[in-house]
Amino acid sequence: MTVTEIARAEGTGKGVDRNAGRGGGSTRRLLPSLARLRLVSGLVLFAFVLTHLLNHALGLVSIAVMDVVQTWRWTIWRSAPGTVLLYGAFVVHIALGVRSLFRRRTWRMPVNDALQIGLGFAIPVLLVGHVLGTRGMHIAAGVDDFYEPVLRRLWPEAVSQSLLVVIVWGHACIGLYHWLRPKPWFPAVAPWLLSAGTALPLLALAGWIEAARRLELLDHGREVPRWPNGETAALAGWLAEVGNQLVFAFMGAVGLGLIAVRVATRLRAKVRISYGGGRLVRARPGPTLLEISRMN
């Protein structure tokens, strides 16, 4: 059977079944459900990031307005259902993202896919410290995490915090693009979405930076509480260390998993695929026909 015939059979669900006798039918039924779950979890995270950046953009108005909207956001995301939904979506999205990475049999891919994967792995490195330093300290020590004290704490880390905004938003927009691109109405709204997707992070960066600079000017020459102080410094240091260990453990586990998958794939027997013109390719089971074609 040629590669064209195999592709046609796979596309129609007839003919070749590489998973026959190995629970292939149940696997194929499971994959769409996992894809939908990954999509839904991504949309939940996108909604959180969207409202968070809109809140940052209000720094162009005033810190007081930022805090008012922040309170509204907390009503949703810090409620018990909102917390379960948000952190559940975070765990599910990461788990399914790592799963899809383990299933990949070649690193030859479109630029968009490579960029999304790279940004996705950069997010935990910058995000864990941000979350533990804000909500983590609020839960553990009751540290005020309204905008004024948070801006004071984050302003010395302006570069990394700004980079976090760009990375998270970039990863989210690439995922949203992959989801919306097949929609028949997408070409008509694409220019508007591109404009909004470009403007929002710029406004968010301008908003939080302007608010932090304005606060720095107001603090000049007056006594203001600094953080971490003697009471919270030890806890902040411990949380930072825990965050670093979590990131290293996650990256190490993913790296070892990828190595294990690669070794297992190489140990499996090869199959033959014939192309038009008489070209014959030997490949190990696992990759899709498209991935095999890219590798050869």
Each language-model region and where it sits:
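Membrane-embedded alpha-helical bundles that constitute the cytochrome b-like, heme-associated redox core
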Residues: M1-A269
